[in-house]
């Protein structure tokens, strides 16, 4: 999945959920890094990180996707799907972080950098925080 959609002008506050679907401690740690990086990047862009989902204009969800690296390969590749949903549930934006990365090449630093880079595509909110 690639970046799709643009956050509408009424989105000023975003609740960031913890990433789901981690199958190992390393993926859980990378998910925590992704959450922190998303909050920091969104705030740096002028969005308000809502402390509660009910207070947010939209919710950013992250889900780990795990697959085999080819038909007969025992190696696994991972990617983190990020989806921004409006309160009503419609998708406003979606992107893939570290798509198709072999598990042994995944690092917290790479996740942090890629999350920040991909969320830049949202652009700034219309009236700041």
Name each model feature, range by range.
Residues 1-14, 35-44, 48-49, 85-129:
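C-terminal/domain-edge helix-coil "capping" segments
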Residues 16-18, 49-75, 80-81:
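A short, hydrophobic beta-strand-centered structural micro-motif
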Residues 19-29, 101-106:
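Second-shell loop/turn segments in exported
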Residues 24, 68-70, 90:
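Residue-level signal for secondary-structure boundary sites
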Residues 26-33, 48-54:
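A generic short-segment signal for beta-strand/edge and adjacent turn/coil regions
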Residues 29-31, 62-64, 74-75, 106-113:
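Surface-exposed beta-strand edges and their flanking turn/coil or helix-capping segments
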């Amino acid at each position: 999945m690639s970046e799709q959609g643009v956050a509408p002008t009424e989105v000023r506050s975003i609740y960031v959920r913890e990433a789901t679907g981690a199958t190992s401690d390393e993926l859980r740690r990378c998910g925590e890094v992704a959450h922190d990086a998303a909050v920091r990047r969104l705030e740096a862009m002028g969005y308000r990180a809502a402390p509660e989902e009910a207070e947010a204009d939209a919710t950013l969800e992250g889900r780990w996707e795990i697959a085999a690296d080819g038909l007969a390969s025992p190696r696994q590749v991972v990617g983190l799907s990020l989806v921004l949903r409006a309160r009503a549930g419609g998708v406003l934006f979606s992107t893939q972080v570290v798509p198709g990365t072999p598990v042994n090449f995944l690092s917290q630093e790479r996740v942090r950098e890629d999350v920040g880079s991909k969320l830049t595509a949202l652009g700034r909110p219309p009236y700041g925080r």
